[in-house]
Amino acid sequence: VELCQRFARRNREKMAEILLDRTGLNGESPFHTVHNYIDVDEMILRKGAVSATEGERILIPINIPDGPLICIAKGNGDCNSSAPHGAGRLMSRAAAFERLTMAEYREQMTGIWSPCISPEPLDESPMAYKSIDEIVNSIGPTAEIVCRLRPIYNFKATPHNSDCAPPAALCTSDFSSNKPILKEFFDSR
């Protein structure tokens, strides 16, 4: 388990390194937030939760259009120094496929560039999750909200989305020549 978790951590770091390298941006103060895992140091299984030791910076995703919250953990012992790992579902994945429509999903994703809005990730649509207000109002015992990030791009890997790719400006090997295109891409969001 520990080896797999170390591999996953390095994988996240490598993806960030590639993104930062290609965009010419820097990662001022990177941090990791892992959910649904076994904390082998503390021997705690965190299902639906993240580590939230006092002072730890954590990221709590809400849903795609609402974006994530960056928080500072409070280390609440009554919660095993854990915090929720996200908004939580209002309905099961199966129910989401039965009840939600692509039209609703597309409408909710307005303003977020995503080449992968298709029926496959319909179960990840914002309507399947609790509202940001509910999370903001209940997170207090475990974490203090520092800020909320505004999403501009979303990619959901599915078995059939090989044609879903970011703009060419995000994929070239010589990214420096595409900075004006990238700036235009981000400024338009």
Model-predicted segments: where are they?
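Domain-length cofactor-binding catalytic modules of enzymes
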Residues: V1-R189
